[in-house]
Amino acid sequence: MTTPSLQTTIEAAWESREGVTLETRGAVRDAVEAVLDGLDAGIYRVAEKIGETWVVHQWLKMAVLLSFRLNDMTPVSGAPGGATWWDKVPSKFAGWGEDRFRAAGFRAVPGAIVRRSAHIAPGVVLMPSFVNLGARVESGAMIDTWATVGSCAQIGRNVHLSGGAGIGGVLEPLQAGPVIIEDNCFIGARSEVAEGVLVETGAVLSMGVFIGASTRVIDRETGEVFMGRVPAYSVVVPGSLPGKPLPDGTPGPGLACAVIVKRVDERTRSKVSINDLLRDTPR
């Protein structure tokens, strides 16, 4: 099928998805399988930047969701001690041998789990980590130990996801956009970016920064407030906002936020170490 015919078939199946079952055969199953293979190979991507705007291809998410209706639970080999897992989604690496890994050109150490339909580009390093279905990890990225890349998330070139960092996934609600981490970003250990937040090129998040769609990202120098995105080449640390007084007049609880402590240009970002960028400067 051509891409337009795939899209038409998937969208029609989605409108009548209650009729899509384990017994469904023919064009619908073939279209879903073609999309999963295309996502896995990097031919398709759930979100792409067109000009200066990120565009989400919802029909590809529809295909991923339809696959859950089409595929039954089945044993998945490879669990510790010779045990098996029980799932609808096979490993990306199922059936791979040395030649396939060499051709793929990335490194996957023991404990790295990648589900089918996630795309891993050449030059990526996967430490013991988890990459969910429909996600895309671009060349040169490091997915460090216990980091997670959620469903359909987009990880740019040379991104470093530090130990235990979490990038939220999104399949439902359908209209929600995926988390996007643009090229050359650094996400500190145990930080979490979720709910469709866009982290723009070259941004640095320190350890323990939590950003969702409603989190206020405040530029300390200008007072400007961002929600849903982190501006390019921002250096961001955890912060808090004073809470409103309680009804009895006593101070209320503070609210978490993220604070932009400085901004750097591309040249500085490429030359200065992450530790130096995160070291606060006297006001």
UniProtKB/Swiss-Prot annotation:
Keyword terms, alphabetized: Acyltransferase, Amino-acid biosynthesis, Cytoplasm, Diaminopimelate biosynthesis, Lysine biosynthesis, Repeat, Transferase
GO CC terms: cytoplasm
Keyword Phosphoprotein on entry: no
Enzyme's top EC category: transferase
Reactions listed under catalytic activity: (S)-2,3,4,5-tetrahydrodipicolinate + succinyl-CoA + H2O = (S)-2-succinylamino-6-oxoheptanedioate + CoA
Domain of life: Bacteria
Subcellular location: Cytoplasm
Pathway: Amino-acid biosynthesis; L-lysine biosynthesis via DAP pathway; LL-2,6-diaminopimelate from (S)-tetrahydrodipicolinate (succinylase route): step 1/3
E.C. designation(s): 2.3.1.117
Chief localization: cytoplasm
Record InterPro entries: DapD_Trfase_Hexpep_rpt_fam (IPR005664), Hexapep (IPR001451), THP_succinylTrfase_dom1 (IPR023180), THP_succinylTrfase_N_sf (IPR037133), Trimer_LpxA-like_sf (IPR011004)
GO BP annotation list: diaminopimelate biosynthetic process; lysine biosynthetic process via diaminopimelate
Bilayer-crossing regions: none
Molecular-function GO term, any one: nucleotidyltransferase activity
Binding-site list for substrate: 107, 144
Gene3D superfamilies: Hexapeptide repeat proteins, Tetrahydrodipicolinate-N-succinyltransferase, N-terminal domain
Family: Belongs to the transferase hexapeptide repeat family.
Matches recorded under PANTHER family: 2,3,4,5-TETRAHYDROPYRIDINE-2,6-DICARBOXYLATE N-SUCCINYLTRANSFERASE, MOLYBDENUM COFACTOR GUANYLYLTRANSFERASE
Assembly description: Homotrimer.
Protein name: 2,3,4,5-tetrahydropyridine-2,6-dicarboxylate N-succinyltransferase
Protein encoded by which gene: dapD
